[in-house]
Amino acid sequence: MKELDLTQGSVPKVLLQFAVPFLIANVLQALYGGADLFVVGQYDDSASVAAVAIGSQVMQTITGIILGITTGTTVLIAIATGAKDDRQVASTIGSSIWLFSIIGIVLTLVMVLFHDRISSLMHTPTEAMEDTKSYILVCSVGILFIVGYNVVCGILRGLGDSKTPLYFVGLACIINIVLDFILVGAFHLGPTGAAIATVTAQGVSFTIALWFLYRRGFHFEFTRRDIRLNRVLSKRVLTLGAPIALQDALINVSFLIITCLLYTSPSPRDKRQSR
């Protein structure tokens, strides 16, 4: 992997070299739901479009929270890397694997168990309710892929490599769009097909990212003994990542509220008919 040494060279230049790929990757990751929405809109009715719009916004909120928390891992690894403390880097990586495995399992269980309740809380239109539940349920099964991908990318960014994660998410977007057209356009699976496409793309992206990390390895010793939960490091990861996760969550929740208001407010036609 090509690691960028952020402690040397011109600060503005190095910062741009690192930040631009990171920003583009985040934008592409947010476009999963947009791709689903576009393709479903080409082949299905308005109820299906509403289901994907609601479901993708819910999943985007979850993704934002995960991305925010993994930033804590990136920051700790970057600090240890700058200090040339390879043991601290290895311990942070190992502890993060445990921490985010737990977070991923908990989020998956919560979303799978309460996907129907979440759909109801979103004031989903009756005609779109079943498709919304299906979309959220299928996407929830893939939460571990979202967590795993963001952890791997967080590790790479902490080591100074922000370009490789961009390639991973770019590939995932292409796979998602292709599968959307196949499952929604050719097989007419509607929102469920779009959700399957998204989860498959995320799974492929995570698998390739994990394979890349394994094949390329680290410039320091990292063994199975390093993969253990360190409470101090885990607390620091959460302390650093929680404010960013909260910020992303609040932004996405505001969009969720707007979505709810759109589906609870009477349309102009309904207002005219009530007069």
Q: Across the structure, where does each feature detected by a protein language model lie?
A:
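Hydrophobic transmembrane alpha-helices of multi-pass small-molecule transporters
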Residues: 61, 176-177, 206-210
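Single conserved hydrophobic/aromatic residue that forms the stacking wall/gate
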Residues: 263-275
